[in-house]
Amino acid sequence: MRVSSASSTPPPPAFAAAAWAVVLLAMLRSDVALAAAASSNDDTGLSPLMPPPPLAAPVPAAVSPAPATPPAVLSPRKLLRPQGADVVGVGFVSGSGGGGGGDGVRTRRVDDGCAGADDIAIYQGRATPLPSGVPAYTVDVMNRCAGGGGGDEECAIAGIHVRCGWFSSVSLVDPRVFRRLGHDDCLLNDGRPLLAGETVSFEYTNSFPYKLSVSVATCVVDPAAP
């Protein structure tokens, strides 16, 4: 009887292929582990990037306070004016210039008597407009001289000239009361004197009011003289 030895029998092909597959898988896993270890060693000691510190906010420059505006100084002199009227212009003290000086001119304090143009006040207000709608204005010119003991004659003021621009009126203004002689020069009361407290009034119509102010006024010693 013939007996065969088991050790001499070669392994089947499927078993050999499986064995080689196991060996290759083990080698592949070993290579992956080594690569991971090397990558971990390369990253060791590196710190993550830190963002830059925030910039400090700019400090605004100090602003010096604005100087305080001094209060306006009001004149102690009060004006006597009709109720409901607006002061448009008050004359200035006139001397020998402007075509109004000459004999009889006296520049004095108001308490002592006539002060010339400084005693003439012009009040202007609105009046009833024309039927066509053109605005109307009323003007009152008053001699405010208080007198110095010599009576109304001491406060007589004549030759009153008014700054009036290119004054004109749609309605007629009595030229004996107020008329324009030239540009910015109008004559009041035909040049005749106003006594203390006297008022001359007139009315004019235009699309806008004129700014009126006294330019020249003359104190007269004897208002009855021609």
Curated annotation (Swiss-Prot):
Keyword Signal listed: yes
Outcome of swapping Q83P: In mil2-2; defective in early anther development
GO biological process, one term: anther wall tapetum cell fate specification
Gene name linked to the record: TDL1A
Signal peptide residue numbers: 1-35
UniProt-listed InterPro entries: TPD1
Subunit composition and interactions: Interacts with MSP1.
UniProt keyword terms in alphabetical order: Differentiation, Signal
Gene inactivation effect: Male-sterile phenotype due to the absence of tapetal cells in the developing anthers.
Keyword Nuclease: no
Tissue: Expressed in roots, and anthers and ovules during meiosis.
Functional description taken from the UniProt entry: Involved in cell specification during anther development. Required for the differentiation of primary parietal cells into secondary parietal cells in anthers. May serve as an extracellular ligand for the MSP1 receptor kinase to limit sporocyte number in ovules.
Superkingdom as given in the UniProt entry: Eukaryota
Listed name of the protein: TPD1 protein homolog 1A
